[in-house]
């Protein structure tokens, strides 16, 4: 296992090896085409995190329908100011950026560890949009987070670029406060960590964070806020392409034709440029 100094697991060696899986990696995601305003969905400020960093601004849309405990924890710690000043202390090139440590090497908050939320149960209340079936289930989105749902209704997030998740020790029920942001597709991580959201603004910032374990000059989160807590005059308005709209349907068809059997939801970029 690969661990931090305190033993916190981020990725198993096998998972790192799968950074170059036999399945073809997604090409550069196909960006959302020009589309009318009705094809775009505004991100709810109450369900988004604004992360100011030394490299720029990141917005993560939260996914409480997938991981309600993790989302509640992230919001609680954010509102305490817990993440302000935290380092990106473990950053693997072309893979992920891990943060939540202020240099004290405690690796956790004073709150109890969280129960693993590697999967979720799709119900009538789940804000799920299907984009097509696969063997034994269905592919779709919960908000901006790509997911797969089995025939039995059990769903799990796909580890596309921008996905936000929580690391843990050997015991899967030990996620607490730290998180990592994916820089690329990593299908081997599915159902092994709790996914709590996805970057909808600033993936370029995530990829610009200085690499290293630890980096020689680590970047940090200077300030983290729930987007709804940001004064309206300062609050960025973030929109993503609605996967239930016609523009998305065209994007999906175009991308599936281009990628053929190598198609993945990670090939799709829902951010684009909203009107």
What are these regions (language model features)?
Residues 1-4:
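Positively charged n-region of N-terminal signal peptides that target proteins for export
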